[in-house]
Amino acid sequence: MEKLSHGLVTSRNMIRYKSSQLPERVLQFGEGNFLRGFIDWMIQQMNKQNVFNGRVVAIQPTPHGKVVPKLQEQDSLYTVWLRGIADGETVDHHEVITSISRGLNPYTNWQDVLEVAASPDISVVFSNTTEAGLTYLEEGYDKEKAPLSFPGKLAACLWHRYETLGWGEGSGLVIIPCELVEQNGKVLKELVCRYAKAWNFPQEFFTWLERENEFCHTLVDRIVPGFPSDTADECFERLGYEDILLTVAEPYHLFIIEGSERVRKLLPFNEAGLHVRWNHLEKHRNMKVRVLNGTHTFMFALSYLSGVDTVGEAMADEQLCSFIRKGLFEEIIPCVDAPEQEVTAFAETVLERFENPFLQHRLTDIGLNAVNKFRTRLMPTFNDYVAQTGEAPTYLLFSLAALINYYRGVEEDGPFLIGRRREDSYLIRDDLEVIEAFKVGWQQVNTGKLSLAQLCEDLLSKRELWGVDLSMERKVVDKVAESLQIIVEKGMRQAISGVLNQIGGNNHVHKQ
């Protein structure tokens, strides 16, 4: 079977517009499933309507990335396949995406990245490096070498752009982070300034950064499972070609941007019929991150270690679905600051999206950087629940115990760990200090130096993992330790059954 390439799409007349002639207008940090199935897909829709007319240069965000070589192998082409239900109708539509001009590895081609960053054609920056990407890493500045962190790379790129273009018209950029971090634009800007200060950039750079550049707050919403591993051959047969970057996504999409009129004119999403809202972000952000992303993080470890592989399989499993719904409706929803009827309706819609039979959203993908995700997506709910009830949330803490068990590595894979579920193995990937904490903790359990209860107390005491010292609350430690003990001794299924049998609806938080 032929592989996706420029030659293939040309010979089959699959592209109806001259995308290869469009200038590079977007610098994008990240090239993973989400950006390809959301931002780059949106740019393609605008290009098709002749309202943006630009392409993306995708930058590999970490040294361990594997997408850029695949982009190069396929002439920067890939397919987005939208599958699901929209407005009561089945959507099953695929198209070749041509909005990426090239992918660059900054660790081997840093000067090429800087050259793109200084191009007058570049007007906007997008990023999605996960919550773990918007952090500060102590590192020096070397103009010949890419910084390791994303904010460091962006600071270096902006400095090079300023050095090259100065205060000329159009020298500044619109910077739109898509990471699920509250006030992500402000957070990223502060990190860039912190690097610039540490690297002794001159005051005039800070003035230019403030006056000519705009950092936007955003909220993104689309489930993008990415490559359909289990049905790839069947998909290739339907497509008529092989695509190693095939990206499956749901039809639903929502992009909320807090930005000026400058941003609206630069990115006329709405003119292309895209579901993009401007401003009024905070209410929807709180609801979406806690209900959708929070539930994903809540469910992934306990579901995967119960023997299922995807979100859809978990929702189709009676026991798991019951547990997930109880955790969502009894502990997460009551802590969302919005009218209960509105939140409940949104939650039911989210569960319908989880049940999408066309998607294979792998739980192990949700499990990447899971400790970071737990801290940002579930700890705010945990804190609110404790404040409202004075009690420790049973379902959330069981999920935390499942996460601790999920992070039990059996071998190392470079800087990361490999976990095992019976005959299956999975990658445990997170910040290096997170990996080290779990690796050392589980090694001490394996050698008899720590009991499971002591492991829990040790891990829960680490503020760098959870944002607070969870070991200060004895009942929190006891609940997590008890759940972990049962999970390890009797298995995840029996542990879940025990929680479901113990608890009725009496721990529901009632809003005032």
Curated annotation (Swiss-Prot):
Membrane-spanning ranges: none
Protein origin, superkingdom: Bacteria
GO (cellular component) term, any one: cytosol
Binding of NAD(+), residues: V26, L27, Q28, F29, G30, E31, G32, N33, F34, L35, R36, G37
Record's keyword terms, sorted: NAD, Oxidoreductase
GO molecular function: mannitol-1-phosphate 5-dehydrogenase activity; tagaturonate reductase activity
EC number of the protein: 1.1.1.58
Pathway: Carbohydrate metabolism; pentose and glucuronate interconversion
A Pfam cross-reference name: Mannitol_dh_C
Catalytic activity of the protein: D-altronate + NAD(+) = keto-D-tagaturonate + NADH + H(+)
Biological process according to GO: D-galacturonate catabolic process; mannitol catabolic process
Claim: Ribonucleoprotein is one of the keywords in the record: no
HAMAP family attached to this UniProt entry: Altron_oxidoreduct
Entry's family note: Belongs to the mannitol dehydrogenase family. UxaB subfamily.
Protein's name according to its UniProt entry: Altronate oxidoreductase
Organism (species): Halalkalibacterium halodurans (strain ATCC BAA-125 / DSM 18197 / FERM 7344 / JCM 9153 / C-125) (Bacillus halodurans)
